[in-house]
Amino acid sequence: MLAFTLRRAIQAIGVMIAVGIIAFSMFRFAGDPVNQMVSIDTPYAERAAIRQSLGLNDPIPVQFVRYFANAVQFNFGISYQFRQPVASLLKERMPATLELAIVATIFAMVFGILMGVYSALHEDSLLAKLFQAVSLIGISLPTFLIGILLIYLFAVILGWLPSFGRGQVVKLGWWTTGLLTVSGLKALIMPSITLGLFQMTLIMRLVRAEMLEVLRTDYIRFARARGLTTRAIHFGHALRNTLVPVITVAGLQFGSVIAFAIITETVFQWPGMGLLFVQAVQNVDIPIMAAYLLMVSLIFVTINFVVDILYTIVDPRLRSTISRPA
């Protein structure tokens, strides 16, 4: 188990180094960073001084080592657009994105599992067919269109929910949350549904397929022959084994939720890291773009690492395979 953990950790470090190279290359391919920081009338001498202060005259390997060393300390440089440290901008926007992603994931997990279990246990019921239709809609419609439809229905026509923003938030140290205010909760409903709908349909379909497969296995037949109750068979045995692959998918999808929150945050003008990234792209703000790439990659790598470890703990077969000598 220890060797497996170390091997996964080394692979994670290798991935982050590769991503660091890509992020560093963005500065080279997007033109001279000095041109993004100064006006067109800036004298050449001042430009040269800025280049020297930024270390842009050093050899490229030296610049990369310095950039990666600073990135490890979460020092991503100064934003061209905001003239502020990128780390402070990300720190300011991160609570909004994480709060949205966590609520969307909880929504997707709870409703996805419930709908998937019901669809598997009552295949021919009208409600199960309705769930299947909803899953097709959730997978087929693009995220931005779902968001626009929700805004039109609940904000424009009914006027129940706000169409943009985060509402009133409460500061808890450096963290800000809208979960403690009514306006914050109302502002969170539509973005979380928009972001979590695709994940919900994916989890629902996975749970349904796994549940149907597990219910056909021999040990379920044996459990019925022993006289166990239907409730014990369905929820004590079948569902528990069904949730093993769901852990992997849900963990990986959480990273996707954070990465693809860009669209949802843009539609609802949600003040998170995704909206900050869109603004950076519009203004060619390379430090923010590179930092966002590194942060999202770090989240993906960390989630993958944790899911791999949890998977070996939950699944005894995989644990025995890892422990077996080569």
Predicted regions and their residues:
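Hydrophobic alpha-helical segments of integral membrane proteins
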Residues: 9, 50, 60-76, 86, ...
